[in-house]
């Protein structure tokens, strides 16, 4: 006769002991996952703070490098355009008469403007003389036209020297010429045009390449709208000029190593 087996009796755990067991064994199984979650959370928080600090430092550095001086005269906004630079144009043509006519037609005083005194102060423009015929307006010369003036002075001196003209120059003229060289150098360094110019080992470099430029027509329009009506011949209050005399430069035959191409 088969012997009946009695089920084994499991010991009854005290509720407190059951809780202790769960605490010991159950929590030990969950602990790795909890630690991973905590680690990942701390890692995300750390990265967020780090990237935030880097962004703040970068922004602060950019703002510091672009800090505008309080005495910076805010210039009028002039549109940007792309133009080709040519090695030889009408302004450097081998036709000397054409060269002279073009250069002598330039009216640098077209860049003399008159604007409202109060408005100029709002743009941080420096104090200046008043327009004789209208004391409410302040007189300024646009930088680009000052450079045009200096180029004219230097070219006139070069032409006279090449022609063997006998002339004696005053100390003021010497100082003016030195100033123009200096001014053009400062302007060139200020613009720091980094356009890479092609070269094949000859004299000519970069002819026909595109450059990023300010729109001269837009600058001329601004000068027209705010003209001080100043000319070298009649001074202020004279007849306003019909323009600055500049014409668009177009490519012409080019001289390479002593030969016209």
Swiss-Prot record:
Chain location of the short sequence motif HXXHC 2 per the record: 176-180
UniProt short sequence motif HXXHC 1, positions renumbered to this chain: 146-150
Keyword Transmembrane tagged: yes
Gene Ontology terms: cellular component: membrane
Transmembrane segments: 38-58
Family label: Belongs to the ustYa family.
Localisation: Membrane
Keywords: Glycoprotein, Membrane, Oxidoreductase, Transmembrane, Transmembrane helix
Record's bilayer topology term: Single-pass membrane protein
Function: Hydroxylase; part of the gene cluster that mediates the biosynthesis of the mycotoxin cyclochlorotine, a hepatotoxic and carcinogenic cyclic chlorinated pentapeptide. Within the pathway, cctR performs the last step by hydroxylating cyclochlorotine to yield hydroxycyclochlorotine. The NRPS cctN initially catalyzes the condensation of L-serine (Ser), Pro, L-2-aminobutyrate (2Abu), Ser, and beta-Phe in this order to produce isocyclotine.
A single GO BP: mycotoxin biosynthetic process
Uppermost EC category: oxidoreductase
Glycan attachment residues as annotated in the record: 95
Phenotype on disruption: Abolishes the production of hydroxycyclochlorotine.
Keyword Metal-binding tagged: no
Domain-level remarks: The 2 HXXHC motifs are conserved in ustYa family proteins and might form active sites.
Source organism (scientific name): Talaromyces islandicus (Penicillium islandicum)
Name this polypeptide is given: Hydroxylase cctR
EC number: 1.-.-.-
Pathway: Mycotoxin biosynthesis
InterPro entries in alphabetical order: UstYa-like
